[in-house]
Amino acid sequence: MKNLYSNHKTGKKIFLFLQLFFLLGMLYTANAQVMVPFTQRTSQYTPTKKIYNVKGDFTMLGNTNLTLQSYSNTSPNNNNTMVYVDVDGNSIAGLGGSPTFNSSAATLSLSTENGAVPSCSRIIYAGLYWTGRADQSGTASNTFSVTKTINGTSYTKNFDKRKIMFKGPGAANYTQFLASTSDIYYPTSTGDYIYSSYVEVTDYVRQYGVGEYLAADMALRDGNGGGTGYSGGWGLIVVYENSKMKYRDVTLFDGHAYIVSSNTTPFDLPVSGFNTVQTGNVGVKLGMMASEGDVSLTGDYFSIRNLATTNYTNLSHSGNTATNFFNSSINTGGNNRNPNLQNNTGIDISMFTLPNTNNSIIGNSQTSTNFRYGTAGDTYAIFSIAMSVDAYIPEPEGVLSATNINGIPVTAPYTATPGQDITFKVDIKNLGTEAVNNTKIIIPVPYNATYVAGSASGSVFFTPLPTPNNVYFDSTLGSTGSIVWDFGTLPLPASP
């Protein structure tokens, strides 16, 4: 481990302060078709935290709760008869205590990057989203009733678009979650009746961990939903950390943007506040949830601005194309789903790595970018977007210790009397994943101590020497002055 040493004398023990500065930008968007403006989603436990700076990442999972009565990989949900997906075997009570009408499952898996053990990862945040279209005309309500016969018995459920039943790995029963009226969008006649809902489930996912999750009894209708069609499904976003993994800046944001097929105007979504690595390749991962993108209708796209130009690159992943981005595909890293359908009839959940060859899209030390989305033929609604970038997170460590009092070597605990000189040593180490630039240590002198003029010095035990590598006393910094060591770049150690 490389060390940097500074020695100075005062009449009292001095404490080390390493000042790090971060500026986090705000996310915003504005256009005529955004029913609910996109804002950064924060946890109820850390409401001011806009960016998750973690050794870790985010992941996504989810599924559809409606499918075609006559399933086909290429048929859309519009003007077709839809039926409930129900995979839990009617053995577990759902909404209202009766067997579930609709249910589907997906498995939460966490990364094994750099030898990370998923069971040792810590859940930082989990957010549950669900979406559906259950109305065609008139004035829609958040609640409605559906009657269904199961094993010869008739049941009636009073569905609520704000309610969902959720079941974690090993849980005996479903737990009901209720979204706030402001999370996210519940139209009565606009936006093609597509609703989107959200609730934080961090505590629940921490309790049950990795494994299969089921979501059931969403407010959905089966049957023929007309020209747009009925659809419905759910998705879970999880932010987690593991000490083995890379540093990343993770940003989550949601809203409700409705894009109608007749409007070909593109719309922009600026994102700022992350801070990418200073050198080397920048890894970028994107996640998204949307509703009503059809497999058979093309022309819809989602793009990102190139770093060096004002041009945009249309994005795609293994389950879609650049000219049919919203195509009812669920592409979340290969985790298990039940059912595991190619055509999810109006539900898109995507998680994929962006093509960033030679850092052409996101570069080193970049703090903002811009997304653009639009259509030339398909109608859809976006309600959740996630992004992670390889991050620059300085992780220096400073250890302050006294070496002698009045020239006599000492070890802790120390005892000094007024008038004695105390010599301190500051050990600085870089525990991060890359060099720390513009490093400066500022040590305020306590009000009851006096700096011994000319006593501060610095020794560097690596090559090449950093610049400016200057140790000095600044009498104007603080009420009694401060000792400053401005030595420039703190490199990575040769052996951590």
Where are the regions that the model predicts?
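Bacterial Sec-dependent N-terminal signal peptides
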Residues: 1-35
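Polar/charged side chains located within well-ordered beta-strands of beta-rich proteins
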Residues: 19, 369, 398-402, 424, ...
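Disulfide-rich extracellular domains of secreted proteins
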Residues: 33-396, 427
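Solvent-exposed, conformationally flexible loop/turn segments
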Residues: 261-264, 419, 493-496
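Short solvent-exposed strand-capping/beta-turn motif centered on an Asx-Ser/Thr pair
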Residues: 289-293, 376, 403-405, 417, ...
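Low-complexity, acidic Ser/Thr/Pro/Gly-rich terminal tails and inter-domain linkers that flank the onset
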Residues: 390-418, 444-446
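A surface/secretory-pathway sequence property marking extracellular, secreted
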Residues: 401-405, 437-440, 444-495
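Short beta-strand elements of extracellular/lumenal beta-sandwich folds
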Residues: 414-442
